[in-house]
Amino acid sequence: MLKNDLFLRALKRQPCSRTPIWVMRQAGRYLPEYRAVREKTDFLTLCKTPELATEVTIQPVELVGVDAAIIFSDILVVNEAMGQEVNIIETKGIKLAPPIRSQADIDKLIVPDIDEKLGYVLDALRMTKKELDNRVPLIGFSGAAWTLFTYAVEGGGSKNYAYAKQMMYREPQMAHSLLSKISQTITAYTLKQIEAGADAIQIFDSWASALSEDDYREYALPYIKDTVQAIKAKHPETPVIVFSKDCNTILSDIADTGCDAVGLGWGIDISKARTELNDRVALQGNLDPTVLYGTQERIKIEAGKILKSFGQHNHHSGHVFNLGHGILPDMDPDNLRCLVEFVKEESAKYH
């Protein structure tokens, strides 16, 4: 039995004594303890070494006091498992080779055996689960098909997604064949993560806002829905969070995937999202990460606004406090500790 199951209870919209909190990228460079581990190795080796991935996954639980751990990994391990070479250089960015630009390129990609190609993530999950010893839940995750598609086709990050959009608009069938292959891998991968001990899954669609509403409904949401439905068919008790960054105008469509929670960016008032979705899913978010550059007093004010905006909980509401995107590397860990402690104390009165 979990000693602290608030995160899972909130996702399932069950009564909680207070609002749980965790933070995207909580295992990361803002923590000196993470930097000490990272100095000894490169980023992908850290992801692929279960002992090290476990150590940095647990750091924010012990050092910051968050209510959930998220396995330390990267969304691009999926692209690598499918056959692209991935290089992540923190100062220079991300490179994938070869970029996928033709049907022949797509045909060369595989839907991998997850145990064989991504076994190191599963090992890290099992090891972390053991080390956590039921203190808090453990989150597994994957990038969404659209976001991984953009990296695959562009061969890295992009400002305008020119190659990805060209494929969409010139060769829509080709785009769908690549998205489908990526989606099959994501589904198999997330199911394996649950078997390895993940208590919840988050799907990150980091580049969701690159698409119009109509295109998002065609090229992104169906694949997210496929994964969510596959998880729900096999593991109905495992909550799924969908974080489609800055898609504030189609929250209802995101909820229609069957997910348990919708992650929000900071560009929408959480009360508006709650009203629109009418408590049919839990909400996660949505403090602007740059608030953590502020004074601790200001951090409390801004966090308090979100708690107040979400408002009083009822028997079918759920809120997981988080940032609207990942914590930035140069932030003061004491400011995150301040946020975590404040949310724990202040949120009780809304429950």
From Swiss-Prot:
Q: Cite the PROSITE patterns for this sequence.
A: UROD_1, UROD_2
Q: What is this protein called?
A: Uroporphyrinogen decarboxylase
Identify the pathway. Answer: Porphyrin-containing compound metabolism; protoporphyrin-IX biosynthesis; coproporphyrinogen-III from 5-aminolevulinate: step 4/4
Point out the annotated site residues (description: Transition state stabilizer): D74
One GO MF term, please? Answer: uroporphyrinogen decarboxylase activity
Where does the source fall among the domains of life?
Answer: Bacteria
Intracellular or extracellular location(s): Cytoplasm
Q: Which family does it belong to?
A: Belongs to the uroporphyrinogen decarboxylase family.
Q: Which reaction does it catalyse?
A: uroporphyrinogen III + 4 H(+) = coproporphyrinogen III + 4 CO2
Query: What are the record keywords, sorted?
Result: Cytoplasm, Decarboxylase, Lyase, Porphyrin biosynthesis
What are the GO BP annotations of this UniProt entry? protoporphyrinogen IX biosynthetic process
Provide the transmembrane region boundaries.
none
Give the species this sequence originates from: Chlorobium chlorochromatii (strain CaD3)
- Give start-end ranges for the coiled-coil region(s): none
Q: What does this protein do?
A: Catalyzes the decarboxylation of four acetate groups of uroporphyrinogen-III to yield coproporphyrinogen-III.
One Gene Ontology cellular component term attached to this UniProt record is: cytosol
